C-alpha cells in the first residue's frame, strides 16, 4: 500500500473523530451536543452536511473499488471468449454484468465488423460517458468541501453581528457574558466548517485518484482486447 492510499484511508476512517479531537479544552466542560447547540442553526446545518458527506464517502469507497469497476473474473472470461472469437457470448456477459469495464467493452463489441476506427471511437465515447458518470458520483464531496467552510464563515459573521448588537444595545457597556454567546457561535461554526471540509477534501482526493487509476488500467485492458481488430500497417 502506497503512502497516498494509506493517508486516504486514514482520513476516511478518522473523519467522525475529528470533531472530538478538534477542541479538547472545550470538551472538558461541554459535550459535543452542547457545542452543536451553541453553534446555532448554521452549526446544525453543517452537521447535516457532514452526515451527507459521510454517506457519499462510504458509498463511493465501496463502489469505486477496482474489483467493482473492472471485475477480474469477468475480464478473464471475456478475454477467453475473444480468443475463441465468441463475440456474441462476450456481448451477453457485458449486458448481464454491469460495470465500467463491461459498459465500455460492450460498446466496442457492438461495433465489431464496422472497422477498427469505428470500434475505437465507440470505445472512447462510452469511456468518456462512464468516466463523467463516475466523476459526478464523487463531485458532491468537492462541493461539500467548498461549501462547509463558507457555511462556517457565515456563522462567524452572524455570531459577530450578535456580539456587536449586544454592545450597541448596552450602550457600549456589554459584559463579557453578554458577548460570549455571539463570539462562541462565531468560533464554533468556523471550527465545524473546517472539521468537515478537511477530511472530506482528503477523501475526495483519495477516491478521485483511485477512480482515475482504475479507469486508466481498465482502458489499457480494453485496448489490448481490441488490438486484434487493428489493421496491420504495410
What is each model feature region?
Residues 1-27:
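N-terminal secretory/membrane targeting signals
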Residues 5-6, 30, 36-40, 129, ...:
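Membrane-helix interfacial "entry" motifs
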Residues 10, 39-43, 130, 134-148, ...:
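Loop-to-transmembrane-helix entry motif
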Residues 13, 24-73, 207:
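Hydrophobic membrane-targeting segments
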Residues 40, 54, 90, 105, ...:
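Residue-level signature of catalytic and energy-coupling elements of molecular machines
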Residues 45-58, 144, 148-154, 192-196:
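Lipid-exposed faces of alpha-helical membrane segments in multi-pass integral membrane proteins
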Residues 62, 68-154, 158-173, 200-234:
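Predominantly long cytosolic amphipathic alpha-helical stalk/bundle segments
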Residues 177-204, 208:
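Pore-lining and gate-forming transmembrane alpha-helices of multi-pass membrane transport proteins
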